[in-house]
Amino acid sequence: MVCIPCIVIPLLLWVYKRFLEPFLYPIISPIINTFWTKKAVQETAASDQKVSEKSNGTCKPESNGEATANGSTIAADKKTD
């Protein structure tokens, strides 16, 4: 048997999202925006290229000056038993 709050709370949330929020949100949103403003994110212009490559998800593997012939460098990182 399912407890009463497990049925009532999702039902009340659905009623709020479906019927009450479209009327209440335009009234409440200007009030909330007055004290909860979003700050603009500023990117520094003097950032290092390596930092920017890592921050945007395109981190390139760093080379130590030696070329690998046909092997993969990932295999060296795996744990061997």
UniProtKB/Swiss-Prot annotation:
Native source species: Anoplopoma fimbria
Residue segments, region Disordered: 45-81
InterPro entries per the UniProt record, alphabetical: UPF0729_C18orf32-like
A Pfam short name: DUF4512
Polar residues bias (residue ranges): 45-58
Ranges in a coiled coil: none
Protein name: UPF0729 protein C18orf32 homolog
Stated family: Belongs to the UPF0729 family.
